[in-house]
């Protein structure tokens, strides 16, 4: 999660700053209440089956996978703390990459508890407070600013140019333990009721008068807006910032050289939401299938744009951090940025109005 403003491309080489829309539910209506009362369901695009597929085939399994990855990272760092060998260091780094990849696939549904209860910030704030992190080892994690914990704080210590010291290794275990706690907490909030209903139930109750989503389209708007925001962030900020300034250290996972994997997993997460499931094939009632049935021209356009964006992302030479300055690298990055922005634009201009 990047917490600064975003750059967007205008023409080929001109850039300007726009704010990211991270939590907006409605466009074209003045406020949430107006959205629910005034934005009619002119198209029966979103069904209960669409929402259930999104929740049970994508969101919950993805978060369960993230929690498992965080647990494995914590265990790998505990092993490395006890036996600081080169092999254990590499195993811990690989565990971080795996957990990170899984997390990046959830960027397009970072609403609900991830946003409102602070899980996203606690796990993925960037940039981090590097100076503060150096002095934070003795501070309880729950008392820290988000910029001193999470994936990128672990990355900073684990992938440093010099091997982690004893103090660093101890600190890494503390950070990983908190990451696991946050990831498991996010799973719990989606699956289990406490003083509040499970967020899974909140979304599945869409269309009920007492629901946070009084119409199916209200839930559909949340889902589509999440896709728009995530892909817009990838194009305008995660890629756009470093591309504009030609400063590789502005890539979010610069220290680990994992940025390209981040971006590819952002694409994969959006593709999973569009298809309504994480495995191969199209889930019944998915956004993709509903568009194919009701708006086949839009569906065909999106399918092609997703494919083009994937091809462009996978064509960027690795690592992106060291290839940005090369002519080939710059062209490849710009091509990918343009392709991803096209997907976001179609979702925003052609799909979002159908669910408002």
Swiss-Prot record:
CC per GO annotation: plasma membrane
InterPro entries referenced in this protein's UniProt entry, alphabetically: Imelysin-like, Imelysin-like_IrpA, Imelysin_sf
Function: IrpA occurs under iron-deficient growth conditions in cyanobacterium Synechococcus and disappears in cells recovering from iron starvation. It seems to be involved in iron acquisition, uptake or storage.
Alphabetical UniProt keywords: Cell inner membrane, Cell membrane, Iron, Membrane, Signal, Transmembrane
Keyword Ribonucleoprotein: no
CDD domains for this protein: Imelysin-like_IrpA (cd14658)
Hydrophilic: annotated span: 75-145, 240-310
Subcellular location per the Swiss-Prot or TrEMBL entry: Cell inner membrane
Expression induction or repression: By iron deprivation.
The protein's name in its UniProt record: Iron-regulated protein A
Signal peptide start-end: 1-44
Gene3D superfamilies found in the cross-reference section: M75 peptidase, HXXE motif (1.20.1420.20)
Subunit: The iron-regulated protein A is one unit of the protein complex CPVI-4, which is synthesized under iron deficient conditions.
Organism: Synechococcus elongatus (strain ATCC 33912 / PCC 7942 / FACHB-805) (Anacystis nidulans R2)
Domain of life: Bacteria
């Amino acid at each position: 999660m990047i917490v600064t403003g975003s750059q967007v491309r205008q023409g080929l080489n001109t850039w300007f700053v726009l704010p990211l829309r991270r939590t907006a539910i409605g466009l074209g209506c003045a406020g949430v209440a107006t959205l629910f009362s005034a934005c009619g369901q002119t198209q029966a695009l979103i069904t209960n089956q669409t929402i259930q597929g999104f929740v049970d085939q994508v969101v919950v399994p993805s978060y369960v996978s993230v929690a498992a990855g965080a647990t494995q990272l914590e265990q790998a760092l505990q092993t490395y703390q006890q036996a600081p060998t080169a092999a254990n260091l590499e195993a811990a780094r690989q565990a971080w990459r795996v957990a990170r990849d899984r997390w990046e696939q959830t960027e397009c549904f970072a609403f609900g508890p991830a946003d409102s209860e602070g899980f996203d910030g606690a796990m993925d704030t960037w940039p981090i407070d590097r100076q503060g992190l150096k002095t934070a080892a003795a501070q309880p994690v729950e008392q820290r600013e988000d910029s001193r914990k999470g994936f990128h704080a672990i990355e900073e210590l684990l992938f440093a140019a010099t091997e982690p010291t004893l103090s660093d290794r101890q600190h890494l275990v503390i950070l990983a333990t908190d990451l696991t706690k946050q990831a498991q907490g996010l799973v719990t909030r989606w699956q289990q009721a406490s003083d509040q209903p499970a967020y899974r139930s909140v979304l599945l109750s869409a269309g009920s008068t007492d629901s946070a989503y009084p119409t199916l389209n209200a839930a559909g708007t949340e889902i589509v807006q999440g896709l728009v925001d995530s892909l817009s962030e990838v194009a305008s900020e995660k890629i756009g910032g470093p591309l504009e300034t030609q400063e590789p250290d502005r890539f979010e996972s610069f220290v680990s050289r994992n940025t390209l994997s981040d971006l590819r997993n952002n694409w994969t997460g959006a593709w999973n939401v569009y298809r309504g499931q994480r495995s191969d094939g199209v889930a019944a009632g998915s956004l993709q299938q509903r568009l194919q049935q009701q708006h086949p021209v839009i569906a065909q356009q999106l399918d092609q744009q997703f494919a083009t964006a994937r091809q462009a992302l996978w064509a960027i030479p690795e690592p992106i951090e060291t290839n940005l300055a090369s002519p080939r690298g710059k062209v490849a990055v710009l091509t990918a940025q343009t392709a991803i922005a096209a997907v976001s634009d179609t979702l925003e201009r052609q799909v979002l109005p159908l669910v408002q």
